[in-house]
Amino acid sequence: MSGLYKILRDSLTLLKEKPIIFLPKLFSALAGSLWFIGLVSGRISLLNLLLLFGPISIIGVLASLMVASMVKQEEISLKTSFYIALSKWRQSLLLIIAFSMIGFLISLPLSIGIYWYLITGSSIILTSAAIITISLMFAFVFASYFIPITILEEKNFRSSIKESLNVSKSRPKEVTLLTMFSFLLLGLTTASNEYLEALGYIGFLLGRLTSSIATTYIFVVSPKYYLEV
């Protein structure tokens, strides 16, 4: 536990000393928020939204890789971290495709549960479906916890996935605790965002930016732990 506490503390210290690390995730959150506002407001056509979905997804992955690269090499600039992340564009595209497919499969139980609940009114089915989806999500995060840094460390996509899974399996207790911490932090942030969203689109945007701060911290903890174990 003392080792994990040190990782969490050192990650906070790094962010205090180098706040520029927040910028990639803040930019990604801003881009994603504007895309979502365009979706719900109807101000952007469906075709344009579909065309923008790919670039928005790529920005999200590149932001994660930029954070990991600045943790790995604390002395590098934001510009250098961008070029490092961009050099992994093939792995980034494969990651988007793989995560999209896995995300769809993970959401299936809950989607079926909601559909069944609307037809039958069975809360048991809905609750069971939610538990299954959350469990699958937890297992997925556990297995992929180190993917940003392993993509930078490994030569190809397959080996980076395998390395992330192997590290998680070799230290199940610590990675489980870190995964639980990530869920808790994001859960608290999401809950607090409900108050901001009452302010409308501005509140939603502020909530997303707040969440990106918590997400940045999580994406600093992951490579920090990987590089020190």
Residue ranges and their predicted role:
Residues 1-229:
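Hydrophobic alpha-helical membrane segments
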